[in-house]
A protein has these predicted regions:
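Non-heme di-metal
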Residues: 1-231
Length: 231
């Protein structure tokens, strides 16, 4: 019999963004540095809202262990010594783009769609389901994405292991192993009823699809200069 965790993983992996054509090109060194930076700019806009979703859920969840995890995760992301958004910006600057252009850059339609979906998720769905979509459908993907990109950054883009410019990707391999494990544990603990489990699996699947579509927008913009899907 398939376990609840196995069903969650399967729902995520049907549209795991690590398999997206954009990341396939990056892993093979077939994107320019500027094209990789364009992903990071959109990721900046996505992550900025993801942090707000976590803060909102922390205000809604009644369980201390879940609140603690959310605040720990937020603390890691917003560490004043080296914010993760600043790590992203440093990579963009290393690709010869301007630091001030990151926050003020255009938000692609696909990125905005993911942002808006996330707010509907946290406002309208039970907190257990929202966290399943966030922790498993979205956040847990990034570990495998970074495992795919880091070797390429070393081999094809000239960054030495441990280089400050790519610390966002390297550090997420360790951090997301910890976060991913705790995220799964929370969802398994608080989605004990069959109905909640079914909702959680569907939410994870939906989150993965939403992230894939967001990647589609980045692909068309980075490779073809298209800001939306106008024919």
């Amino acid at each position: 019999m398939t376990s609840f965790r196995e069903r969650l993983v399967s729902a995520r992996d049907q549209k795991h963004s690590k398999d997206h054509p954009y990341f396939e090109l990056w892993a093979k060194g077939k994107l320019t540095k500027e094209q990789t930076a364009l992903y990071c700019i959109q990721h900046y806009h996505y992550v900025a809202e993801y942090l707000n979703w976590m803060a909102y859920e922390a205000s809604q969840v009644p369980h201390r262990d879940v609140k603690t995890y959310l605040f720990e995760n937020l603390g890691d992301e917003e560490n004043p010594e080296d914010r993760h958004l600043d790590m992203l910006t440093d990579y963009v600057v290393a690709c010869d783009l301007k630091r001030e252009d990151v926050e003020g850059s255009a938000i692609l339609a696909a990125t905005e769609a993911l942002q808006n979906w996330g707010w509907r998720l946290v406002y309208q769905r039970p907190w257990q389901i929202a966290l399943a979509a966030m922790f498993i459908g979205l956040e847990s993907q990034f570990l495998d994405i970074c495992k795919k990109l880091v070797p390429a950054l070393h081999k094809h883009y000239g960054y030495a292991p441990g280089a400050r410019e790519i610390r966002f990707f390297e550090e997420h391999i360790h951090a997301d192993e910890v976060h991913g494990s705790k995220g799964f544990a929370i969802v398994e603990k608080y989605c004990r009823m069959a109905e909640l489990q079914e909702q959680a699996v569907r939410a994870v699947e939906e989150a993965a699809v939403r992230r894939w579509r967001y990647m589609n927008g980045i692909y068309w913009y980075a490779l073809h200069g298209k800001e939306d899907d106008t024919p």
